Amino acid sequence: ETEKFDENKDYESSKYFKHMKNKVHVLGPGEVVLSSNLIINNTEELVVKPGTTILLADGVSLLTKGRTIFDGKPENPILVKRLDKDKPWGVVAIHGPMSKGSIIKNVTFSGGSTSFLENRLFSGMLSISWTENFFMYNSTVEKNVISDDTLHVIHSSFKISNSHFRNCFGDCIDFDYSRGKIRRLKINNSKNDGIDFMRSDVDASHIKILSAKDKGFSIGEMSNIKISSSEVDASEIGVAVKDMSLLEI
């Protein structure tokens, strides 16, 4: 059963991890410069403290295979951005079953791309893969380059709410083989689709998509999607349903 996410709850990292016996890596607060890839293995956890700015060098990625909390606060958010404004970083990836229950809240990710790590291609600047109970709240993901997806969720369960995706190089969000809920999202200026679904089961409400160069919602490959209280404006196509998919509006 999917854990219920209380958006108003203060996920204090020390309390959240107190029952864990694994090693916990802590980044921040303040500036953290990553000049080479940081990989957290599946027997460890990662906490990023409120008020942290992570500066990633050219092509550098953060891959975490254990449970992860980006513990930003509204008044003390987390920033993940380029060390050099002209050189994109790679990806932030949360991957694998031991990362179950990871949380991203009050974070802005900008200026990443794509990466090939440990014999796996991560196509989203922010990549969530093969995990369960992923939660993202009150965050912004923007200004990626090269990569097909700004946020890519694959083989995972999730809830994503109160977040903004903009200036996307390809699809702003790509859900593959995943299931979950999305609430109160703003999606602006995607060069391809606003949201692309493949073999996914998603309940979406209060989604606003503006200026998708292709489709606002692209629903394909036997997906089962419910959309309510949502709108698509200034886009090439509002909603496309194909490949034996089901859409309830």
Feature-to-residue mapping (PLM):
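Beta-strand/loop edge motif enriched in small/polar residues
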Residues: 1-249
